[in-house]
Amino acid sequence: MRKLFLDAFKHEKLEKPPIWIMRQAGRYLPEYRAVRSKFENFMDMCRNADACCEVALHPLERYDLDAAIVFSDILTIPEAMGMDLKFIKGVGPVFSDPIESEKDLNRLKSAEDSVGDLEYVYNAVRTTKAAINVPLIGFTGSPWTLAAYMVEGSGSKQFSKLRKMMYANPQLMHALLQRLADITVIYLLEQVKAGASSLMIFDTWGGILPLEQYKEFSLKYMEYIAKNVKQKSNVPVVFFTKGGSNFFEELKDKSCDGVGVDWNVTLDQARHRIGVGKVLQGNFDPAFLYGTSDSIRNTVKKNMEFIQSDKLNNYIVNLGHGIYPDINPDNVKIMVDAIREFSV
């Protein structure tokens, strides 16, 4: 197995930085769309281990990447807890029965009763792991991000229902977050047992919070998960809070091994705020892949020259968020090939 991706977490000198791409198995690839068309709804596809494996392999077959990520969705946990999840075209994920009260919280299944309903995810991990020669990344949404959809009922620009609960009924908010954190620990450990070599916690909506609320309602539970997972496994764990660069100083002493960095902060700023103890992952703007081949190469050159000058060995090349569905796959190859021309 190629171990460059895992070697980055050892803080040893590497000849070149590892590469993978958030949402690398996704709608921008025609072969993904062909597989997706065979399923009436998205979750049916997620429950098919062979389909999950096939789409996870597509980017590895096209590009020289150093890791795969299991094909799944962050909302598998709320659905396993008994919530009614539907993916509506043009809207996205929708829960018809959002959490509004303690009564709603009490109707959710326990962690122990929920994990069995997630066996299809572990099957996807096992099937994919057997088919690849690179490390496999398992993942979850952060409790705060899962709660955002569970309370709001869908995605939102303001998440006013979620934030109202946080301020008006913090006890209920914490009770929900703790329930989610407990099941997430089991969920991630099961992914490790099935073959995941690294784990990532996607805190997609942590960036909407003020600092003190971020520490209390988001980071606290990510840290709880990482601590408990690492007590029973030795796989690296990466935190990624979208729009969270203002919170980087809070991560210095946390249990994560790496930090995802978006494009709103430079790598040197991120390193200064986080310190040398964490691997940095990122931070190309996904939109730069809309550019010409020359502009893509020039952007790569600027970033990689910084990495060379800083001897930034604990660094993983990635986008600052998921790749957009209308990106030209050929431009991804230009990016990957340009990165491969550089050594640390």
From Swiss-Prot:
CDD domains for this protein: URO-D
Annotated site, Transition state stabilizer, chain positions: 73
Q: In which pathway does it act?
A: Porphyrin-containing compound metabolism; protoporphyrin-IX biosynthesis; coproporphyrinogen-III from 5-aminolevulinate: step 4/4
In its UniProt record, a GO molecular function of this protein is:
uroporphyrinogen decarboxylase activity
> One Pfam family name from the record?
URO-D
What positions does the entry give for substrate binding? 23-27, 73, 149, 204, 321
| Localization terms from the record | Cytoplasm
Chief localisation class: cytoplasm
Q: Which reaction does it catalyse?
A: uroporphyrinogen III + 4 H(+) = coproporphyrinogen III + 4 CO2
Transmembrane spans = none
Which EC numbers characterise this protein's activity in its record? 4.1.1.37
A single GO cellular-component term on record: cytosol
- Top-rank lineage group of the source organism: Bacteria
User: What is a biological process (GO) this protein takes part in?
Assistant: protoporphyrinogen IX biosynthetic process
The alphabetized UniProt keywords are: Cytoplasm, Decarboxylase, Lyase, Porphyrin biosynthesis
Alphabetized InterPro entries for the sequence: UROD/MetE-like_sf (IPR038071), Uroporphyrinogen_deCO2ase_HemE (IPR006361), Uroporphyrinogen_deCOase (IPR000257)
> DNA repair: present as a keyword of the record?
no
**Enzyme class name:** lyase
Q: What this chain does, per the record?
A: Catalyzes the decarboxylation of four acetate groups of uroporphyrinogen-III to yield coproporphyrinogen-III.
- Subunit: Homodimer.
According to its UniProt record, which protein family does this protein belong to? Belongs to the uroporphyrinogen decarboxylase family.
Q: What is this protein called?
A: Uroporphyrinogen decarboxylase
The organism's lineage is: Bacteria, Pseudomonadati, Pseudomonadota, Gammaproteobacteria, Thiotrichales
Identify the coding gene.
Answer: hemE
